[in-house]
Amino acid sequence: MIYSDAGIFLNETKASLVYSRLSKHIRNLGLSGFREYCELVASPAGAAARREMLSHLTTNFTRFFRENHHFEHLRDHVLPELLQRARSGGRVRIWSAASSDGQEPYSIALTVLSLMPNVADYDFKILATDIDPKILAIARAGAYDESALETVSPAMRKQWFSEVEVQGRRKFQVDDRVKRLITYNELNLMAQWPFKGKFDVIFCRNVVIYFDEPTQMKIWQRFAGLLPEGGHLYIGHSERVSGEAKHVFDNIGITTYRYTTKGLGRKA
């Protein structure tokens, strides 16, 4: 069911993960155990329960500037050319394909703003998508506990965050100047993608690892179709591009790839 809905492959080795993420949820529903829960999500009236199940199973650990080498590479080797294009009237698009609670796309936006504070005046957009509508609501709100900002520099925190109170709790709110660069949309990576144009950069980190090998290969190939020559793909630390997509992605750094049609003639 999870596989057909979202491409997530859960074999016997993932049993402890499933138990840890669902057991409390099942108790909160007042159900007797996993058998009754499975009957619920498999029933014709179980669509909402299946969405809840996906939410619990796909919520991943995230933090600002996680795997910071990606943001350093973006800042030093990718953005200078893209920002020059934007200044010249060109279009720039970045996709955070599994954005979770927003810390990844906000990290991208903060990296961009560190180089070009007035980037919102140009045609420079970041799309952030996730399968979970609840986690997207958190992302859009952009209010985080102080502990989440441990990897944000003091200068960046001072410039782009403000202290607020949310339901009696102390939070740090992302500045609207950061938010306006990002559009959040719900998207299942296994479904049809509604995009008309290409992306200059795609971040898809620590998600494809949950797919089986055939599904992973399809996802890499679909990403390839959305990148222009020289476009960049950043993936998770345990992930590797596989299948036919290996012929069009050059590994240029730690889990960092550049799309190039020059590799089309290479043998596997």
Curated annotation (Swiss-Prot):
InterPro entries: Bact_Chemotaxis_MeTrfase (IPR050903), Chemotaxis_MeTrfase_CheR (IPR026024), CheR_C (IPR022642), CheR_MeTrfase (IPR000780), CheR_N (IPR022641), CheR_N_sf (IPR036804), SAM-dependent_MTases_sf (IPR029063)
GO biological process annotation, one example: methylation
Residues at which S-adenosyl-L-methionine binds: N60, T62, R66, E104, D130, N188, L189, R205, N206
Entry EC no(s): 2.1.1.80
EC primary class: transferase
Catalytic activity: L-glutamyl-[protein] + S-adenosyl-L-methionine = [protein]-L-glutamate 5-O-methyl ester + S-adenosyl-L-homocysteine
Location of the CheR-type methyltransferase domain: 1-262
Alphabetical keyword list: Methyltransferase, S-adenosyl-L-methionine, Transferase
Highest taxon of source: Bacteria
A Pfam family recorded for this sequence: CheR_N
Keyword Transferase: yes
GO molecular function: protein-glutamate O-methyltransferase activity
SMART domains tied to this protein: MeTrc
Function according to Swiss-Prot or TrEMBL: Methylation of the membrane-bound methyl-accepting chemotaxis proteins (MCP) to form gamma-glutamyl methyl ester residues in MCP.
Name this polypeptide is given: Probable chemotaxis protein methyltransferase
Name of the gene: cheRch1
